[in-house]
From Swiss-Prot:
Organism taxonomic ancestry: Eukaryota, Fungi, Dikarya, Ascomycota, Saccharomycotina
Protein name, UniProt field: Altered inheritance of mitochondria protein 32
Gene name of the record: AIM32
Domain of life: Eukaryota
Similarity comment: family membership: Belongs to the AIM32 family.
InterPro entries, alphabetized: Aim32/Apd1-like (IPR009737), Thioredoxin-like_sf (IPR036249)
Length: 311
């Protein structure tokens, strides 16, 4: 029988679901230690000389951004394409090629609006439509709207205004601040005012999400580990009803193995309620343990970076 050490989840009051935070002795067994050591050696053999090696002894940070919306620019092409390795610049804001140049434009229109994360995502299953390579539309999936918006480049400024409508109160620290390592988000919030709000309809697509950082040019550790974790999801048939994708940089590349889960709160009149759960140091051989415990309402302490509720 699996023994667990239960801790009080500090953020439980801020999550829609009820979770136990547990420590698994199994993760510290000799077998698991050997698996992790061998895996890290394998990854390090694949890394360019300019990348710091993957070190399983590095402490997992428990710092995550506090945010209201997550905007995902859907990469074009089928699931076998590799934009996460080829097309995603070290900093996506410097990318001049479509569709990724839309990220810097959207961010500039948002200005200093806090509480909105913007990433690229490369889908690994077929629950959500993908744009074609030469598509005239930009595909944005917005969480917690749980909607796919198809936007023309000329409408990006209005789309930014539309996105701001959901940020009534937000922390002063932006996601960019978080990525460069500034202090934790202060508790105080401030109101954001909007002008020229334009409505966009979007298509509602209600599914949980599993997102794995695979941003190779940001840090090759994530670029090498990301596809391995995706393969573990697929080979082990884990959370097969979830949207699955590789995502651009979300912090934590020092320890790598970063996975974000969005879990919808399936209750009456809770259409847009969900929990955002961030994990790091997730190795492919431990993914099954993580997913099975999560499905049973347990969060593994050794991999947990933090979480928030979203509405």
């Amino acid at each position: 029988m699996l023994r667990t050490t239960v801790r009080t989840l500090q953020q439980q009051a801020f999550l829609h679901h009820s979770f136990e935070r547990v420590s698994l002795p199994e993760l510290h067994s000799t077998i698991k230690d050997v698996q992790t050591t061998c895996y890290c050696q394998n990854i390090n053999a694949r890394l360019p000389s300019t990348t710091d090696p993957l070190d399983p002894q590095i402490r997992l940070s428990d710092r995550t951004p506090y945010y209201n919306k997550h905007v995902l620019l859907v990469s074009p092409g089928d699931k076998f394409a590799q934009p996460w390795k080829i097309a995603w610049n070290h900093n996506l804001d410097t990318n001049l090629n479509r569709p990724y140049n839309a990220i810097s434009k959207l961010r500039s229109y948002l200005g200093k609006s806090p509480g909105i994360l913007i990433n690229a995502v490369h889908l690994q299953n077929d629950f959500i439509p993908r744009p074609k390579e030469d598509d005239e539309w930009l595909f944005f999936f917005v969480i917690p709207d749980m909607k796919l918006y198809k936007i023309s480049e000329t409408d990006l400024e209005q789309f930014a205004s539309f996105l701001n409508e959901g940020v009534v109160q937000a922390p002063r620290l932006s996601f960019q601040d978080y990525l460069i390592g500034k202090a934790r988000v202060p508790q105080e919030t401030h109101k954001v005012h909007h002008k020229n709000l334009t409505k966009f309809q979007g298509d509602i697509l209600l599914r949980d999400w599993s997102l794995v950082c695979g941003h190779y040019k940001r840090d090759a550790k994530c670029g090498e580990m990301g596809p391995d974790i995706i393969a573990a999801f697929q080979d082990e048939k884990l959370l097969t009803d979830n949207n699955l994708g590789l995502i651009s940089h979300v912090g934590g590349h020092v320890f790598a193995g970063n996975v974000i889960f969005y879990k919808l709160f399936k209750a009456e009149n809770a259409l847009n309620k969900l929990d955002s759960l961030w994990f790091g140091k997730v190795y492919p051989h431990n993914l099954k343990l993580l997913c099975e415990n999560l499905e049973n309402g347990k969060i593994i302490d050794e991999m947990y970076r933090g979480g928030i509720s979203m509405n």
